[in-house]
UniProtKB/Swiss-Prot annotation:
Gene behind this protein: HSPA4L
Subcellular location: Cytoplasm; Nucleus
Assembly, per entry: Homodimer.
GO CC, any one term: cytoplasm
GO function terms (MF aspect): adenyl-nucleotide exchange factor activity; ATP binding; ATP-dependent protein folding chaperone
Protein name according to UniProt: Heat shock 70 kDa protein 4L
């Protein structure tokens, strides 16, 4: 089983894998560990990653990038409309109201949902992982910003399904960084001591996130998280772009923002300039050739000017830092370390703002680009049964408070209950008790919409079905379990009705459960419930999430253990209690329908197949082109001596015609046409290539055969001279060897003489394969005869053996015992003999 962590960034993506040696960030086909989050669609195929990034300027309208913020949002969303102004490609309203991308693919205009676009990118990352690991990849952990809402998280989960990935967890980026930091620390305080508090600051290309985390040995607990979803490296790029646009408008009388291609080039140059200014404080030039209207533009900028230009952006660094400390109830002196990650944290002014707030040096021990991917890979390894990882528990939190609303029995009345407050531990489950006589609907929404970077407070509605009054006409007791799962997504996990079944006999005197007794019991069990919750935080798996029970009034009631005891008491007093599961109908905000998701998965499969077929077609075409260029080059060099002038002229014409055909009629042909064309060319080229190869390899083959003949002749000569090494050989067989050698020499001389009379342009008389076969034939016939080993001299039998003839088995003895003794004597003799040899 593969263990993969994916950092799905706004600008770039990183992939980390867990191997026996640890966590490793893998490289793509360009030997680059960074894969741009970019997809370019063409008339026949798609380019994804590095190949797509190179087409941003050349294929402006059909190259998709910067789409991460469009997840889970409607087309009319203010954020989508803001992004629409920035993006050079066209956005379109999809049939379900969500934002989509309109591009030209396979010679027609096509809309793609954001889930499809991200699915394409994830499929590419999956392919890169499989190429590196040499095995299929399915399970993974994908990073998302901590401020993503339920709709955005579900959208990313759908994109993973489109790519054929099984996402074990959607992990908050800052939590992934904290895991990558903490799991390797050997000096963390024990569980019974005060935890070590660490601040993690992540400023990427599009967002700014801050997290405070408490570490103990084997434990990570997120205390608070804050963010600015609209502050990142691209905002600093935009400040530079706006500055230079104004300057060029005055200096060169050109409006850069009217030309999307020129604007993209300026963005690229400003990003480079920003990175250079992080390392240099002096004036740095900006030069772009043939920028617009065949104009070359130039300017300059230094770090001081840049910081002054971005003063309003730098002022936004401190508020999230202040807010996270307030939410965590910590002072500056409580913080042990400040860790920074993300590309934009390399800007000196950003570092200065952070240092100024905390009044201590910041730490850069983590890899600013790869820390998120590494944390995701570690989480995947923890969740995977295939890897044994050091025990390490992770407790994340709910970034926004969540409230449930339902209709009450009063006319036009409704009830509300805040089930999860802000910064509540997650994953977590709670049980809420309702008293209902009919099916009812629960509406989940974010309590404080002004805190959520999303225009719609609704999460979804959940209808609890099959609720009926009890047999005695009373309201049914319905227990509803709500959960924030391992992905940070809210759901109504289950619902059940408690049905009373009276025992035989009169139980009218049995005590009833009243509001008073309920409240008194609540006081007795509150402390115990809180302890159970804290213990439950140690596990990050959804199936191990802690639970808490709430009455429909919103007041906390009994813990699970206490409630079970009460049920037992009520059963003894009043009768049997039966729990029946109820069906739940969910209607989630911006949820993709299963049919639509299946169509996206099917379309992705078709596009992958189209890419594969196009690659094979291009490979076949390139093979023809490569053969033409390579053979033409060889005709002027190594093949020149092996072709007549007439044939050279004809073949050169064929090669030239093929080259012209490739760029004219053969520009766009099916794969089989190119395969046939290559075979046709090889009919001309292979005879020449064969002559060249025969000429190159023939001398070595002839030399090897000559050496073998000489070697056998030396043995024959030694045999004739009565050499004692060969005096055991059979004379008849040696005569056969002499005849074989004589025939081989005659064959060799005749073939060499005939070959020497031919020119290099003629077909050879004898092929290398024939010479090699003759050499093997000689070996097979002569070697068994001339290398026949001498027979060993007979060794005289030992005299004690004669005496042993009288040592047969006596009466009452078996032959087996005698044999055993004989074996023992033999072994002793052998040992003795061995000792003598040593001496």
């Amino acid at each position: 089983m593969s263990v993969v962590g994916i950092d799905l960034g706004f600008l770039n993506c990183y992939i980390a894998v867990a191997r026996s040696g640890g966590i490793e960030t893998i490289a793509n086909e360009y030997s680059d560990r960074c894969t741009p989050a970019c997809i370019s669609l063409g008339s026949r195929t798609r380019a994804i990653g590095n190949a797509a990034k190179s087409q941003i300027v050349t294929n402006v309208r059909n190259t998709i990038h910067g789409f991460k913020k469009l997840h889970g949002r409607s087309f009319d969303d203010p954020i989508v409309q803001t992004e629409r102004i920035r993006l050079p490609y066209e956005l379109q309203k999809m049939p379900n109201g969500s934002a989509g991308v309109k591009v030209r693919y396979l010679e027609e205009e096509r809309p793609f949902a954001i889930e499809q676009v991200t699915g394409m990118l994830l499929a590419k990352l999956k392919e890169t992982s499989e190429n590196a690991l040499k095995k299929p990849v399915a399970d993974c952990v994908i990073s998302i910003p901590s401020f993503f809402t339920d709709a955005e998280r579900r959208s990313v989960m759908a994109a993973a399904q489109v790519a054929g990935l099984n996402c074990l967890r959607l992990m908050n980026e800052t939590t992934a960084v904290a895991l990558a930091y903490g799991i390797y620390k050997q000096d963390l305080p024990p569980l019974d001591e005060k935890p070590r508090n660490v601040v993690f600051i992540d400023m990427g290309h599009s967002a700014y996130q801050v997290l405070v985390c408490a570490f103990n040995k084997g434990k990570l607990k997120v205390l608070a998280t804050t963010f600015d979803p609209y502050l990142g490296g691209r905002n600093f790029d935009e400040a530079l772009v706006d500055y230079f646009c104004d300057e060029f408008k005055t200096k060169y009388k050109i409006n850069v923002k009217e030309n999307s291609r020129a604007l993209l080039r300026l963005y690229q140059e400003c990003e480079k300039l920003k990175k250079l200014m992080s390392a240099n404080a002096s004036d740095l030039p900006l030069n772009i050739e043939c920028f617009m209207n065949d104009l070359d533009v130039s300017s300059k900028m230094n770090r001081a000017q840049f910081e002054q230009l971005c003063a309003s952006l730098l002022a936004r660094v401190e508020p999230p830092l202040k807010a996270v400390m307030e939410q965590a109830n910590l002072q500056r002196e409580d913080i042990s370390s400040i860790e920074i990650v993300g590309g934009a944290t390399r800007i000196p002014a950003v570092k200065e703002q952070i240092t100024k707030f905390f009044l201590k040096d910041i730490s850069t021990t983590l890899n600013a680009d790869e820390a998120v991917a590494r944390g995701c890979a570690l989480q995947c390894a923890i969740l995977s049964p295939a890897f044994k990882v050091r025990e390490f528990s992770i407790t994340d939190l709910v970034p926004y408070s969540i409230t449930l609303r339902w209709k009450t029995s009063f006319e036009d009345g409704s009830g509300e209950c805040e089930v999860f407050c802000k910064n509540h531990p997650a994953p977590f489950s709670k049980v809420i008790t309702f008293h209902k006589k009919e099916p009812f609907e629960l509406e989940a929404f974010y309590t404080n919409l002004h805190e959520v970077p999303y225009p719609d407070a609704r999460i979804g509605s959940f209808t609890i079905q099959n609720v009926f009054p009890q047999s005695d006409g009373d309201s049914s007791k319905v227990k509803v379990k709500v959960r924030v799962n391992i992905h940070g997504i809210f759901s109504v996990a289950s619902a059940s009705v408690i049905e009373k079944q009276n025992l035989e006999g009169d139980h009218s005197d049995a005590p009833m459960e009243t509001e008073t007794s309920f409240k008194n019991e609540n006081k007795d069990n509150m402390d115990k419930m809180q302890v159970d919750q804290e213990e439950g935080h140690q596990k990050c798996h959804a199936e191990h999430t802690p639970e808490e029970e709430i009455d429909h009034t919103g007041a906390k009631t009994k813990s699970a253990v206490s409630d079970k005891q009460d049920r037992l008491n009520q059963t003894l007093k009043k009768g049997k209690v039966k729990s029946i599961d109820l069906p739940i109908q969910s209607s989630l905000c911006r949820q993709l329908g299963q049919d639509l998701l299946n169509s996206y998965i099917e379309n992705e499969g078709k596009m992958i197949m189209q890419d594969k077929l196009e690659k094979e077609r291009n490979d076949a075409k390139n093979a023809v082109e490569e053969y033409v260029y390579d053979f033409r080059d060889r005709l002027g060099t190594v093949y020149e001596k092996f072709i007549t002038p007439e044939d050279l002229s004809k073949l050169s014409a064929v090669l030239e015609d093929t080259e012209n055909w490739l760029y004219e009629d053969g520009e766009d042909q099916p794969k089989q046409v190119y395969v046939d064309k290559l075979q046709e060319l090889k009919k001309y080229g292979q005879p020449i290539q064969m002559k060249y190869m025969e000429h190159e390899e023939r001398p070595k083959a002839l030399n090897d055969l000559g050496k073998k003949i000489q070697l056998v002749m030396k043995v024959i000569e030694a045999y004739r001279n009565k050499d004692e090494r060969y005096d055991h050989l059979d004379p008849t067989e040696m005569e056969k060897v002499e005849k074989c050698i004589s025939d081989a020499m005659s064959w060799l001389n005749s073939k060499m003489n005939a070959q020497n009379k031919l020119s290099l342009t003629q077909d050879p008389v004898v092929k290398v394969s024939e010479i090699v076969a003759k050499s093997k034939e000689l070996d097979n016939f002569c070697n068994p005869i001339i290398y026949k080993p001498k027979p060993k001299a007979e060794v005289p039998e030992d005299k004690p053996k004669a005496n042993s003839e009288h040592n047969g088995p006596m009466d009452g003895q078996s032959g087996t015992e005698t044999k055993s003794d004989s074996t023992k004597d033999s072994s002793q003799h052998t040992k003795s003999s061995g000792e003598m040899e040593v001496d």
